[in-house]
Regions:
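Non-ligating segments of multi-cofactor redox enzymes
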Residues: 1-500
Length: 500
């Protein structure tokens, strides 16, 4: 057993209002420089829709993630020989048309235009070439709120298998927002795809980062990530990606997207996992077994034996206590109401989602008059949304989605009976039993999902870096290269012997 700690996130999709505040604050913080105009470390997609970049879930085209070949886990894009053959041209990479050509407007013409009978016009101008554009054609949220209708919705890879059942009436009854950041996976394919070894997963908290000095701009990480959350800076010729706001998380603060989230949909916490189980879990044959296999990697932070082994692995008590109070542990592992995004990619993602209940319940007419018995068949009869949610969150396993929706429905009915009344207690208890939950668990869920305070939603211990370096030696060191003390093994050797 090799215990590691992972900082993870859960997003409650029922609470997302699609305001894009998270996207704007993230961009103003991290990608407001030349070369990063098209980068959105955090973006909010309207579903059903193609997403950003277009049809990023089409792994047959982009060849992101992992696959099983002869029972062994292999990169879908091929191994080192394949990458060497395509080292100067990556055929699987998304193009500018899949993202978009970022633009601004000629505002100077509005301010300094001469007097005229006609109003001046601010023409769109490319932020890459600096030339005027005839018209913008796409953007990161171009299809927001199902804009584009019948032309855009069929581009969603998750919808294409359901085309026979879907008409335009479908979009009136089912629409959801899907906020996305880097998944900071336990088995990241972007890290394995990099020929330079520039991407790495931090040992202390599991955050996946890019070493800007080691990056050579081969861009295999871009197509290797099935979630398309690694970008190429055309100005610096380096890869960039979401870094989970590590300067903030090291200080015990939430990511900037979480801090500014209007709907308070995000929860951040620590989970403990057995790193030795990750490869076997990602190698299970049936993609629908990957969810349970990933759950099997997580460890119980309340187990005294696990605590002792975690301390032996260098995880201090503050992190163990944070894992015990973690909202991610409660929702993803204990209550099992949060699910991973596309587990079939075999990357073991660590940003999980509570599926939306509203599209299911809004389909029911006169919901207030519906007796408790009616909720169970209502959830079962909504096959199309359940299949759609399953294609995103459970590798197509509708039974997993059904269990989560039943538990969320039981919570809604139970809390309605407690706060408003009018619910038959016997039928309520039958629904709670069918959902395999309890009144105590439901009340805990309702508090965390509905009225949890800041400190309950974000349980983030400060960074564990006190033993990384010799701080006495570094005290007073100058940042100027020519004046700074020598570094490395030779310097440490000399310092220990009083030679410096």
């Amino acid at each position: 057993m090799r215990i590691k700690a992972q900082v993870a996130m859960v997003m409650h999709l029922d609470k997302c209002i699609g305001c894009h505040t998270c996207s704007v604050t993230c961009k103003n913080t991290w990608t407001n420089r030349p070369g990063t105009e098209y980068m959105w470390f955090n973006n909010v997609e309207t579903r059903p829709g193609p997403g950003y970049p277009k049809q990023w879930e089409d792994t047959d085209r982009f060849k992101g993630g992992w696959e099983l070949k002869n029972g062994k886990l292999k990169l879908k894009a091929g191994g080192p020989i394949t990458k060497l053959a395509n080292i100067f041209y990556n055929p699987d990479m998304a193009t500018m048309e899949d993202y978009y050509e970022p633009w601004t407007y000629d505002y100077d013409n509005l301010i300094h235009s001469p007097k005229s009978e006609n109003l001046p016009v601010a023409r769109p101008k490319s932020m890459i070439t600096g030339k005027f554009m005839d018209k913008p054609e796409w953007g990161s949220n171009w299809d927001d709120d199902l804009a584009g209708g019948s032309e855009i919705v069929p581009l969603d890879p998750n919808v294409q298998e359901l085309q026979d059942h879907i008409s335009m009436e479908y979009e009136k009854t089912f629409m959801m927002y899907l906020p996305r950041i880097c998944e900071h996976c336990l088995n990241p394919s972007c890290v394995a795809s990099c020929p330079s070894g520039a991407l790495y997963k931090r040992d202390e908290d599991g955050i996946v980062l890019v070493d800007q000095d080691a990056c050579r701009g081969w861009r295999f990480c871009m197509s290797g990530c099935p979630y398309h959350k690694v970008y190429y800076n055309w100005n610096t010729h380096k890869a960039e990606k979401c870094n989970f706001c590590y300067p903030r998380t090291e200080a015990g603060l939430p990511t900037i997207c979480s801090e500014t989230c209007v709907g308070r949909i995000r929860y951040i916490g620590v989970v403990l996992y057995d790193a030795d189980k990750v490869k076997d879990a990602a190698s299970v044959e049936d993609p629908q077994d990957l969810y349970e296999a990933q759950l099997g990697c997580f460890l119980d932070p309340f187990d005294p034996e696990i605590q002792d082994k975690a301390r032996e692995a260098g995880i201090n008590d503050a992190w163990i206590e944070a894992a015990q109070d973690s909202p991610v542990y409660k929702m993803a592992i204990k209550w099992k109401i949060a699910l991973p995004l596309h587990p079939e990619y075999r990357t073991m993602p660590m940003v999980w989602y509570v599926p939306p209940l509203s599209p299911i319940m809004n389909h029911i007419t006169n919901e207030d008059e519906l007796n408790t018995d009616g909720y169970i068949p209502a959830v079962d009869q909504m096959r199309i949304p359940m299949e759609y949610l399953a294609s995103i969150l459970s590798a197509g396993d509708t039974e997993v989605i059904r269990k989560v929706l039943l538990k969320l429905t039981a919570m809604r009915v139970f809390m309605r009976g407690k706060t408003v009344g009018g619910v038959d207690e016997f039928k309520q208890s039958e629904l709670v039993r069918e959902a395999n939950t309890s009144p105590e668990e439901i009340e805990d869920m309702a508090r965390l999902l509905g009225v949890a305070k800041y400190v309950e939603r974000y349980v983030i211990p400060t960074g564990r870096r006190e033993m990384d370096d010799d701080l006495d030696y570094q005290q007073g060191a100058c940042s100027l290269e020519d004046l700074a003390p020598r570094e490395g093994a030779a310097a440490t050797f000399a310092y220990e012997r009083g030679m410096l």
